[in-house]
Amino acid sequence: FSASATFTNRFAFIHPEKIKALAIGGFNGELMLPEKKINQFKFNYPLGIHDFYQLFNKNFDINQFKSIPQFIYMGKLDDNDAVQFDDAYNDIERNLINTNLGSDVQNRYLKCQEIYKKKNINATFITYENVGHWTTSEMNLEVIKFFLNQMQTD
């Protein structure tokens, strides 16, 4: 959840072969995207995969990434936005995100969902009503059920 969700999302791009399933929530509405460019703007790591080979000395394995079942969730009232602060993103990244994905957490989350769906990423997106930047027992139970289901299909 939150910063650990952002870490998990990025780790899955770098090492998709090590992940059987993942669940992330409360991540500022900004997912790393399986795109080199959006609206003709280069999306470098940690926003996208434009410079992936240069950084990791391997190509991004989109097929392996697509094979990961992902449970991605946000609270509808979550407006916690690390994108707007220097400790999370630099000025160039912040401008790319705000201009191309949206400056509002919830709209950005919807845009990221569109991109994941267009790329056929194996993700289930859930938005929880009346929830901000926190978890509830309902959310925790859904995450548990998601992982139990993944264990049973393995």
Where are these regions (language model features)?
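Proline-centered flexible-loop/turn and helix-kink motifs
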Residues: 16-17, 121
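The feature captures the conserved acid-bearing segment of alpha/beta-hydrolase catalytic domains
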Residues: 21, 29-119
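Conserved alpha/beta-hydrolase "nucleophile elbow" surrounding the catalytic nucleophile
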Residues: 1-2
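A structural signal for isolated positions on well-ordered beta-strands in alpha/beta enzyme cores
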Residues: 23, 71, 124-126
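Short glycine-enriched nucleophile-adjacent loop
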Residues: 5-16, 22
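Short catalytic/ligand-binding loop motif for oxyanion handling, primarily in non-cytosolic enzymes
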Residues: 6-8, 31-33, 80-82, 133-137
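N-terminal Rossmann-fold cofactor-binding loop
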Residues: 26
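C-terminal catalytic histidine-bearing segment of alpha/beta-hydrolase fold enzymes
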Residues: 107-154
